Amino acid sequence: CKSSRVHFVGRLSDEDLKLHHYAAAVFAFPSVTKNEAFGVALAEAMYCGTPAVTFTIPGSGVNWVSLNGETGIEVPNGDDKAFAEAIDKLIDDKELSKCYAENGMKRVRDNFTIPKMVEEMEKCYRELEG
């Protein structure tokens, strides 16, 4: 499926996926249930500098990964109209999109990379040692 602004590209290799994230104007993350416990795809897109649009999902990690008004736009769960409007807003407002993209890259680097996870694990082990 392809339109002037939306592309469904099907299955991609990891390398092609990364290139698509870097090229995308917006990452629309359509999950509406807690089944998406963390949102790895969301973090991957943010790491590549793609601002996100998400739904509010109480109790999930999605809204912990992307912060409303800081790294992207969060809309009420199931509000498709607000979701579409948020996508349009990020496409139309280049400055806002750039700000969210930069904040998103920093958030992922500071919290969700392997070196950061190793650092946090080492800290836990040191605390256990006493």
What is each model feature region?
Residues 1-12:
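Nucleotide-activated donor-binding/catalytic signature segment of Leloir-type glycosyltransferases, i.e.
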Residues 48-56:
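Short hydrophobic beta-strand element within catalytic cores of glycosyltransferases
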Residues 22-37, 50:
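Acidic donor-binding loop of glycosyltransferase active sites
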Residues 82, 89, 96-111, 117-123, ...:
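A short, well-ordered alpha-helix in the C-terminal region of glycosyltransferases
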Residues 67-80, 89-95:
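Conserved acidic donor-binding segment of nucleotide-sugar-dependent glycosyltransferases
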Residues 18, 40-47, 63-64, 70:
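Short alpha-helical segment that forms part of, or immediately flanks, the ligand-binding pocket
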